[in-house]
Amino acid sequence: MEALMIRGVLEVHTDFTRQNVMIMEPQVLDFTVRGDKLWLHTEHGLLVSMAEYRSELLCTSAFLGYSAVFLLETEDAVTQVRLSDLRLKHRCGIVKADNLLHFALCTVISCVENCNLTRKCLHDLLQYLDAVNVRESFGRLLHHSARRLICSALYLLFEEKEPHIVQYVPATFVLFQQTRHTCLQLVARFFFRLTGQDEAHSFSLKLTERKTVDGWPVGLGLLDVLNANYPNLPSPPKLPPRWERGEEE
């Protein structure tokens, strides 16, 4: 059975007019992992705990949550998303991340998809996933999605092929990697719609840079859904007083 994954995770903010929303990549360069706790190295040169990072975002009225696209793992064919424009829009939504663990997992997914993390950082994040205790179903879906994305990044970007990594890599990613190395032009042309060898050797985990089978950019489709439902998107959670002081659960 194909696994369901949460992809296309980006910060959702209102623009300066407060009439529209925009999606933004996280301003994170690296993570530090200590057991089941995460610290983030930001683009501004700061080292902050996940609770502090969440508190900073929730204290701004512009932050609404995290975008999400719900995909079966084989629907991301690396070079495109195997959905029509209409079906894609029915898979888009927003995640409130109403507790620290959900927020942390959304941040991890977003950074693995959209940031250039080192191999060591990716392995540290796997250790973090092993350390956290996820009890409810949506948290387990976030946890599962994060693990599959991290293992996919290690497999595609660093060519790690250990069984404990490959078992979490979607089959389409494995086929794509094999195609890149064996130059099977027939597979490249008809399955992945690649027209040249240079295209076969360039790829990204950024879902919003993909196009649907109709040629529509996923990022634009996601924005269309969010703006069509704004301002009726769910509100971000209220912070308990101790979180506003930067304390963790």
Swiss-Prot record:
Pfam families assigned: Herpes_UL7
Gene that produces this protein: UL103
InterPro entries to which the protein is assigned, alphabetical: Herpes_UL7
GO CC terms, sorted: host cell Golgi apparatus; viral tegument
Coiled coil: none
This protein's UniProt keywords: Host cytoplasm, Host Golgi apparatus, Virion, Virion tegument
Family assignment from sequence similarity: Belongs to the herpesviridae cytoplasmic envelopment protein 1 family.
Function in brief: Plays a critical role in cytoplasmic virus egress. Participates in the final step of tegumentation and envelope acquisition within the host cytoplasm.
S-S bridge residues: none
Cell compartments where the protein resides: Virion; Virion tegument; Host cytoplasm; Host Golgi apparatus
Cleavable signal peptide: none
Name listed for the protein in its UniProt record: Cytoplasmic envelopment protein 1
Keyword tRNA processing: no
